[in-house]
Amino acid sequence: MKAGLILPQGWFGEFESWDPIRAYERIIELAKLAERLGIESLWTGEHVLTKWGGEQVLLECVTLTAALAVEVPRVELGFTVLNSTFRNPALTAKMASTLDVISRGRLTLGLGCGFREDEADAFGYEFLPTKQRLALLGEHLEIISQMVTADAPPADFTGEYATVRQLVNNPRSVQRPRIPILIGGHGPNVTFRLAAKYCDEINLDVLPAATAQARSVLAQRCEEIGRDPHTLAVSISVPPSLAWRGLDGGGQRMMRPDEIAFVDAASATDLPSRVEAFASWREQGLSRVVAGVPGLALSDDPLYTFIDDCREAGLEMAGQST
């Protein structure tokens, strides 16, 4: 199992009162350090408002990833995830194809259907019910799959939420056979079926105890359509707000005060350590963990601790085979 790092962008208020240029420079500093320390992949996510409101600095993920593609030359890059509610799928595919060129074939295109109604309202996007948002995501996956696959014919699709007609996309993908497509989520009915039909990877957000059941259902969804379950990579997403036993968050807890009080009051046996969780996921055969690390805006120290935990858990770091 490999180690991916979710970079801070400001969604958790990490850059409150920061100059935006300094915030950008700090993100690049962290990305370069993570690459040197053996991180396999760097990830950004799509939020357009900070989690708890306010006017803190928050940087947009696609343009930030374009900068990362230039500034950080070796590690893989990905999204956890783009919000299809905000996006035209054909334009998303075109942007992804361009990013794959800029990065020399290092992009994983992560897609989801969004969950924050306040963000949609603020930007004037319609926030559909969950069932409809997932249907929209399915249509986006169909169009994008056609557009980012090398040597495919022009994309053509007519749906309820999106339509393209004989659409040529050049370049399509530096990678072969296509840009890898990731879906985020843990819904066993719709999300898992979309993963089986369209995706190269699914990024789950479940704890170690629930992982085996999720993988069992994923295997069923693949088998329903005649796909070998082993061809669908399974990874885990760990937000920086997730609490671990023995980890204080490096000065930025990424939680509301009431959440901090709840975690601090928990018994040591109620929470696994990060090493224990990562080792469990590795033993269950997951492809990678994609983790946020609290406190990175303020200090490099939490990143070094994270790297140590990854190594102790037996994760494969760049330049090392496990």
Predicted feature descriptions by range:
Residues E35-R36, T65-R74, A96, D100-L107, ...:
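Acidic (Asp/Glu)-rich catalytic clusters
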Residues Q9-E25, L82-A90, P177-G187, M255-P272:
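Active-site mouth loops of central-metabolism enzymes
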Residues F79, N88-Y198, A212-L218, P229-H230:
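Internal, glycine-rich beta/alpha segment that forms the wall or movable "lid"
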Residues M1-E71, I179, P294-A297, D301, ...:
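N-terminal beta1-alpha1-beta2 module of alpha/beta enzyme domains
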Residues E55-G78, L136-I143, M147, E224, ...:
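Alpha-helix-loop-beta-strand connector modules within alpha/beta enzyme cores
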Residues I21-A34, T92-M95, G184-K197, G251, ...:
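Short, acidic/polar
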Residues M1-W18, R74, F115-D121, E160-I179, ...:
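N-terminal small/glycine-rich loop or linker at the start of catalytic domains
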Residues A3-L7, L42-T44, E76-F79, L107-L111, ...:
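Hydrophobic faces of well-ordered beta-strands that scaffold small-molecule active sites
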